[in-house]
C-alpha cells in the first residue's frame, strides 16, 4: 500500500490485527516529503505518515519499501533513519526493474540487473501470506495481483495453498 487511503482510525484497527511477527503491511514510500509524490502521484505525505504511525502505534508490524530513482537516491539513508524512528520493523530500498516511466530516471551508477536463473521462492508458501490490491481485492500472491482470473473471495481458499508445493495453478 502507499498508505494514502483510509483514516488513522482504520489503520489503527488494522494494526491491532497485524501484530504477530509473521503479519505485516508493506508501505511503499518512495523517498521523503519532497519526493514521494513524484512517483506516488497525488499521495499526501502527511496522510501517509499519520496512517503509518497509527498502524505502528496500534501494534502493527510495518515494512517500508522504497523505489529508488535519480530524484530520490540521495534520500535513502534519511528515509531508512525515519523508518527506524517511526518504528517500522524493516526497510528496503530497491531500484525498480519495471519499464522506465516517462520523466523518471534510474539512479546514478545503475546497471541492468542480471537475469536470475535460480529457483523461484514462493513468498506465499514461505510467509503464509496473501496480497490485497489497492481496490481491496484478495489474490493468492503479489505476482498475480490485478489478474482478475485468479481473484480470491475467501481467505480460507488462500490458506489452503499454504500446505501445498504449488500455491496456485497459474504459478506452474
Task: List each model region and its residues.
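Radical SAM/AdoMet-radical enzyme domain recognition
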Residues: 1-94
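Accessory C-terminal segments flanking Radical SAM cores
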Residues: 88-92, 96-172
